Amino acid sequence: MEKNNLKKILQEKMEKAIKVLGNELKGLRTGRASVNFLDSVTVEAYGSKVPLAQVASLSTPDARTINVQVWDKSMVSSVEKGITIANLGLTHATDGQLIRLPIPSLTEERRKEFVKLAHKYGEETKISLRNIRRDGIEELKKLEKDNIIVKDEYHSLSEQVQKLTDEYSSKVDSAIKQKEHEIMTV
């Protein structure tokens, strides 16, 4: 690996780790209704499993309700089944092609569980970042051993890798702090 590409490659890997964290945090329920909450729902449609968003329009008319407007009337029962199978802890009311999902308020205990889960996701992401950093440092050691870079360059590039890791680690902290605030706000 070339020393010039190393930082860029590490940055891309760290960016992916942050994206994964973002997707995991989207799945955590806050007290508010959000269509992102249904991202994990898949529906049996025309012989294959597809995301819910491909067979229905999703909207939040208020802070406590998600509406699922199914486009094809024959798909309503499949959508209901998909929502049930996703095990989101939601009940639904069907009115023709419209499925309403009332979002119950979270108890204090449940909010704390979600905060713990958010912190767990954050810690897993930080572990990924540290592993990416370790791989980068090992690559630098290999470049130094092969006399592609000198010791001063190795130390300089190692510091850059550490700064990059610190930068992404602080992004994880702020994402977790923001999600914790969302969850704990009643």
From Swiss-Prot:
Cellular location(s): Cytoplasm
Biological processes per GO annotation: cytoplasmic translational termination
InterPro entries: Ribosome_recyc_fac (IPR002661), Ribosome_recyc_fac_dom (IPR023584), RRF_sf (IPR036191)
GO cellular component, one term: cytosol
One of the record's GO molecular function terms: ribosomal large subunit binding
Record carries keyword Nucleotide-binding: no
UniProtKB keywords: Cytoplasm, Protein biosynthesis
Entry's family note: Belongs to the RRF family.
Protein's recorded name: Ribosome-recycling factor
Organism of origin: Rickettsia typhi (strain ATCC VR-144 / Wilmington)
Species lineage: Bacteria, Pseudomonadati, Pseudomonadota, Alphaproteobacteria, Rickettsiales
